[in-house]
Structure formats: structure tokens, C-alpha cells
A protein has these predicted regions:
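Final/C-terminal transmembrane alpha-helix of multipass membrane proteins
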Residues: 277-296
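Long, contiguous internal "core" modules enriched in hydrophobic/ aromatic residues
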Residues: 17, 24-26, 43-46, 98, ...
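Membrane helical hairpin/interfacial module
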Residues: 29-85, 89-106
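Alpha-helical transmembrane segments of multi-pass membrane proteins
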Residues: 66-69, 260, 285-286
């Protein structure tokens, strides 16, 4: 292994393509959006509730689409149910030792809670005329239970893709213990950014959105620090990014992290009305970050 930074250089790549990169991105948006909305429902005031609606509107469709992408990537979508059910006994199949199995079940369970919260948000907005659905949201007892359990699985889904990569024996992925943390922080950042954009589009630019802006700025700063820690922890494996992927990663850092922080500061400093541009940059940067991590490790 002389001259090779890590033994992971000798492993075979899983050949994950764009569908998986998009699946990672949408899964992070779904988990992060639901987790943030659950926190708002559990600890926020009444004026925060419209903002939580936006997160629930994001979580369920993103989960449905990410599940579809995962099934299509398997090559035989109609057999995706085999991830949950044993084909010979038709009993539930759960492999506690497999991050893929745990993640699949977490996606399904979060999908259940996200669907309930999605219906409740529609009912509260008057788009479904069934008042009983409103009880599926806090502060009702049932709503609190749904928010707590769904929020837990949302947090898990937001970071599990990073853990999945970490247990896959490839350069970069298994050479740092921080990918799960990076994906969690990135999911929180991109989810906040998407909720901000939807708030502007729907006209819900309340002081609560300004609070979300400030929170996202702190999360972006934390994401930058975690990414730096990832790079330091890679040691000699960092040489895998001394190519086009490293250039793209630099673009992610500049345009997806530093630029949003600068633009956000300028907007508050000079009392500008909209902060939509920084939020859009964060979203693009979050997707490209996953592209870099997924593809660079397979190109070695």
C-alpha cells in the first residue's frame, strides 16, 4: 500500500449515480423540515404555527419522492417491498445490524408521521374540511405525540445518509467519523433555507421568518466548521479532492456558505427587505455538497 493514503483505495465503488445524490438531498430536506416544524409546534408560539405548516408541506412530498428515487435506483422498483417484508414468510424484515435496513424503516415511519402532519396542516389552512384532522397537531395530546416521535425520526433521517456512507468502505466516506454530523447540520441549513423561500413566496414574511434567518446563519457557520473538521480528519485522504471535485467543493464553500452569510449580514445591516438570495444559494450549495461527497469517493 505504499503511496496510498488509505486501504479504502482498494475497495470497489457502489456505482451510485445522480438518483442517489438527489435522494440524499431530498431525504435531508424531508427530515430537517419535519424536525424543525416539530420543534416549532412543541416549543413555538401561536404566531410560529404558519411557518411550521411550510415544513410539513415540504416533508411529506420530499419523503415520497426520495422513496421513489431509492426504489428506482434499485433497478427493480416493484420489488422494493422486499426491504420491509420477507418474500417467503411475508413477515416484517428488520436487520438491526444494517444501516440500509434501519434507514429504510426510518424513512417509512417518518413518512407515516409526515403524512399525518401534512393532513393536519392542510386542515388548519382550510384546504381540507375535516376539523378532526387539526387534532393531529400540537398542542393537542395526539399532536404532541406525533411531533415528538416524528421529530425524532426526522432528526435520524436527516443524518442517516451520512452514517450510511461512513460504513461503506470507500475513500472519504469511511475515513472520517463526521459525515453523519455534517449531513445533519447541512439538512438543518437547507431545510431552513427552503422554508424561508416558501415563506416569501406565500407572503408569510413575519418576524418569525427573520428569526429563522438568524438561526440559519448560525447553522451555516456551524456547517462550515464541521466541513473544515471533516477535511482535517481525512488527513492524507484529503488528496482525493485535489481535482475537479475539490474545485466544486471550494465553490460550495464560497457560494453555498460564505456568500449567504455575507449577503444575510448586508441585508440586515442595510435593512433590505428580502433575504431570498442567500436562502437559494444555501439550497444549491447543499445539493452540490452531496454531489461532491457521493461522486468524489467513487472516482478514486
Amino acid at each position: 500500500m505504499t503511496g496510498v493514503p488509505s486501504s479504502t483505495w482498494f475497495s470497489a465503488a457502489p456505482h451510485w449515480e445522480w438518483l442517489i445524490a438527489l435522494y440524499f438531498f431530498l431525504g435531508g430536506l424531508a427530515g430537517g423540515s419535519y424536525f424543525l416544524s416539530a420543534l416549532i409546534d412543541l416549543f413555538g408560539s401561536r404566531e410560529h404555527r404558519p411557518l411550521a405548516h411550510l415544513g410539513y408541506y415540504v416533508a411529506f412530498p420530499c419523503l415520497a419522492l426520495s422513496g421513489l428515487l431509492l426504489a428506482v435506483d434499485l433497478g427493480r422498483p416493484l420489488r422494493a417491498w422486499h426491504m420491509f417484508i420477507q418474500s417467503n414468510t411475508y413477515r416484517p424484515m428488520f436487520k438491526y445490524w444494517s444501516p440500509m435496513s434501519i434507514g429504510s424503516w426510518a424513512l417509512a415511519i417518518l413518512g407515516f408521521f409526515a403524512f399525518l402532519s401534512f393532513l393536519a396542516a392542510l386542515a388548519e389552512d382550510g384546504r381540507i374540511r375535516w376539523s378532526g384532522l387539526r387534532r393531529l397537531r400540537a398542542p393537542s395530546p395526539a399532536g404532541r405525540i406525533i411531533a415528538v416521535l416524528g421529530g425524532f425520526f426526522g432528526f435520524y433521517v436527516a443524518g442517516y445518509t451520512g452514517v450510511l456512507l461512513a460504513v461503506t468502505n470507500r475513500p472519504i466516506w469511511s475515513d472520517t467519523p463526521l459525515l453523519g454530523l455534517l449531513f445533519i447540520v447541512s439538512a438543518a441549513s437547507t431545510s431552513s433555507a427552503l422554508m424561508i423561500l416558501l415563506a416569501y413566496r406565500s407572503g408569510r414574511t413575519t418576524p418569525v421568518v427573520a428569526d429563522l434567518h438568524r438561526m440559519d446563519d448560525w447553522v451555516i457557520a456551524l456547517e462550515l466548521l464541521v466541513l473544515i473538521a471533516v477535511m482535517v480528519s481525512l488527513g492524507p485522504v484529503l488528496s482525493a479532492w485535489l481535482n475537479v471535485w475539490g474545485i466544486l467543493l471550494a465553490i460550495v464553500i464560497v457560494l453555498g456558505m460564505i456568500a449567504p452569510l455575507v449577503l444575510s449580514w448586508r441585508a440586515r445591516r442595510f435593512h433590505q427587505v428580502t433575504l431570498a438570495t442567500p436562502a437559494l444559494l444555501v439550497l444549491v450549495g447543499g445539493f452540490l455538497l452531496r454531489v461532491v461527497i457521493v461522486f468524489s469517493a467513487q472516482s478514486v
